[in-house]
């Protein structure tokens, strides 16, 4: 049976792993129950994503995260969009931590009204079961304006197959489709997936989306904080996708006060992705050698960046 947690009144007693987020200017201290810290989204990444989301037309209503973990991402969405939120988490300790973390962000960033805090709710329960959760929310059936899903993946998996995700995408889509608002551009959904997905798996995700929302715009987004790795791979859908733009690369700078670098473009995902063939060219005076982010290469947009930046004058 789902259990309701109210962030306005939830106590932090019994919670642990209360550690500072070094990427936040405010030096927030977040709770991460049951070894949740390695899985949590850094505040700088969560905030950058929320600021990007603000550029799109998200319908009126609440923000839903049906596998909210420590609640950092959904707190960032609420803080930037000024919307109430619904966070669902199967693990009770993490659900409680999410509620307390949300209250921390709300109070320390100095919101003047308690309405958003009062109207937000966290639930210990199965994030797939929209029909069980909706009666607890006292909302109209189409009140979900935006769905965020970051399914858990096995830590020791190298492949991160779609069948290993929990909850699975089709189960969440089926459980929540009746309650998600749809504009002329489709639903506003963000799927935060494993950076290890192959191009074939990415196409599998796209096909799954098409089963529930045909002809929906899709923009794959690779996010990096450097260090030679892809930090996040997400699929932005419908109302929050870039029309006719299949790919986006986002580089989060080390300085949390600096804006991210964003590059749009690329080709639709293909099962056999094009590979960059090495070019053996004798360097000429005035040519450039570029050392670029590995995630930019992974996104398939390295040539887009090079052509835009150097107009072809590179080795």
Language-model regions, residue ranges each:
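Glycine-rich phosphate-binding loop signature in dinucleotide/nucleotide-binding domains
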Residues: 56-59, 137-143
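Class I S-adenosyl-L-methionine
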Residues: 148, 153-315
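Conserved SAM-binding motif I beta-strand of class I
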Residues: 84-89
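Conserved acidic residues
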Residues: 61, 145, 187
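S-adenosyl-L-methionine
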Residues: 1-61, 93-141
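Conserved SAM-binding loop of SAM-dependent methyltransferases across substrates and taxa
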Residues: 70-82
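Conserved class I S-adenosyl-L-methionine
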Residues: 60-69
